[in-house]
């Protein structure tokens, strides 16, 4: 086998590989003989079909298969010999056969050489937060509201009330599609409607008819309504006040607490809040570290890896549509290219961090991650056992652990400052509610 390597552009490489023709002819001959032994052709005894007949019937297909196998096998031998690391599947183009040799070309991309830079320039503001008694009380108040019952009242509508109404919306005096509803229910303060709609109902009583002026946001989904001033003619038919359950042992029982009553509920709430806080703190620091790593390291990305990631993201997006995908056209790659490129770059950079620091997934950390995730389920031990018995899930958890270890390794050289922050403020920002 003879090999020549050509760097065409960027990460693309072109291998020209020559293989002795006699090697291919021997493989073709051997394959024809094997086929002759098992072929069943009318007019010939089993195993006695002449090679010429087999060659006439199956020769072209057999030769094509052999050529494919030869190209694949010799390509692998060539990249090992040349110490090349392909980033995707090669494209094979068969060349000439002059009787002495068979030549073919393999084109592919290689992984870029990654040299980590600016690790000591990464800046991280590490938030410090804890769950206080007041935070637990706030959560209990939220749970009370979620379990509220409503009853009609004869007073002005206030924040937190549930109202029923009929309304008609218009822009420039003309009703618009989707702007009319009867017996519409709305909890004031829920933020379901456009700005100004809910506040415009405050202070009105059942039976009143009134008009409120609002403006559709510039980012509103309907193109014909973006940024437009609108009027809503409203007839308020009912105002319902919330009746919140008392905070006692009976309240705790609503959440499956059979022993320990209210104190047990508070302990469970605190545990869940602490778990969510820990996850959010980790995610916050990780995002800062990753952003710093990306900003300080510019690398050329293999198109093959980006294309592969685009396909993954596209499939995930289609799965979210569920049964609605049957008649949907394929989502364009452009929707996912930027995110795919970011994910590929992160993977390459973190891979180099793992390699440089000789990191291996710590078993204790892996089990800790599984236990933390399982604690959110009714039977944690069952979830832990399931993960430990599933090779694919275990590999996923090892990858998560390795990523955590890589981030921790980067933190050691980063410029880290700590900042005290209240639980509610931090979690609101983390969940996008701020």
UniProtKB/Swiss-Prot annotation:
It is found in: Cytoplasm. It is an enzyme of class 5 (isomerase). Keywords: Cell cycle, Cell division, Chaperone, Cytoplasm, Isomerase, Rotamase. GO terms for cellular component: cytoplasm. It holds the Pfam family Trigger_C. One of its GO terms (molecular function) is peptidyl-prolyl cis-trans isomerase activity. This is Trigger factor. It comes from Shewanella baltica (strain OS185). Involved in protein export. Acts as a chaperone by maintaining the newly synthesized protein in an open conformation. Functions as a peptidyl-prolyl cis-trans isomerase. The lineage of its organism: Bacteria, Pseudomonadati, Pseudomonadota, Gammaproteobacteria, Alteromonadales.
């Amino acid at each position: 086998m003879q090999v020549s390597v050509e760097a065409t552009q960027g990460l693309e490489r072109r291998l020209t590989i020559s293989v002795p023709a006699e090697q291919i002819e021997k493989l073709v001959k051997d394959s024809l003989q094997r086929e002759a032994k098992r072929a069943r052709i009318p007019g010939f005894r089993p195993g006695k079909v002449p090679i010429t007949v087999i060659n006439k019937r199956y020769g072209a297909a057999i030769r094509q298969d052999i050529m494919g196998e030869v190209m694949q096998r010799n390509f692998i031998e060539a990249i090992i010999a040349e110490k090349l690391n392909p980033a995707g599947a090669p494209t094979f183009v068969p060349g000439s056969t002059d009787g002495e040799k068979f030549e073919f070309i393999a084109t592919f991309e290689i992984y870029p050489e990654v040299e980590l830079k600016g690790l000591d320039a990464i800046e991280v503001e590490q938030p410090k937060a804890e769950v206080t008694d007041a935070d637990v009380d706030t959560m209990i108040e939220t749970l009370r509201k979620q379990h509220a019952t409503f009853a009609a009242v004869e007073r002005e509508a206030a924040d937190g009330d549930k109202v029923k109404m009929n309304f008609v919306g218009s822009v420039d005096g003309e009703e618009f599609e989707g702007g009319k509803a009867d017996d519409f229910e709305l909890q004031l303060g829920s933020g379901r409607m456009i700005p100004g709609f809910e506040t415009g109902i405050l202070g009105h009583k059942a039976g009143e008819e009134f008009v409120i002026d609002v403006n559709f946001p510039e980012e509103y989904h309907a193109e014909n309504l973006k940024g437009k001033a609108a009027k809503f003619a409203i007839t308020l038919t009912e105002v319902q006040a919330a009746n919140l359950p008392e905070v006692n042992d009976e309240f705790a029982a609503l959440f499956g607490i059979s022993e320990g009553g209210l104190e047990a509920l508070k302990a469970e709430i605190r545990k869940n809040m602490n778990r969510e806080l820990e996850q959010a703190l980790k995610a916050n620091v990780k995002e800062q570290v990753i952003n710093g790593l990306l900003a300080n390291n510019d690398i050329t990305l293999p198109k093959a890896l980006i294309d592969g990631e685009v396909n993954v993201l596209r499939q995930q997006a289609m799965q979210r549509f569920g049964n609605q995908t049957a008649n949907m056209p394929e989502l364009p790659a452009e929707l996912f290219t930027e995110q795919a490129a970011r994910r590929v770059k992160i993977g390459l950079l973190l891979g180099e961090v793992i390699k440089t620091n000789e990191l291996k997934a710590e078993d204790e950390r892996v089990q800790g991650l599984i236990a933390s995730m399982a604690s959110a389920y009714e039977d944690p031990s069952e979830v832990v056992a399931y993960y430990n018995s599933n090779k694919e899930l275990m590999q996923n958890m090892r990858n998560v652990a390795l990523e955590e270890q890589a981030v921790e390794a980067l933190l050691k050289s980063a410029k880290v400052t700590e900042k005290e922050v209240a639980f509610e403020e931090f979690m609101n920002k983390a969940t996008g509610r701020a």
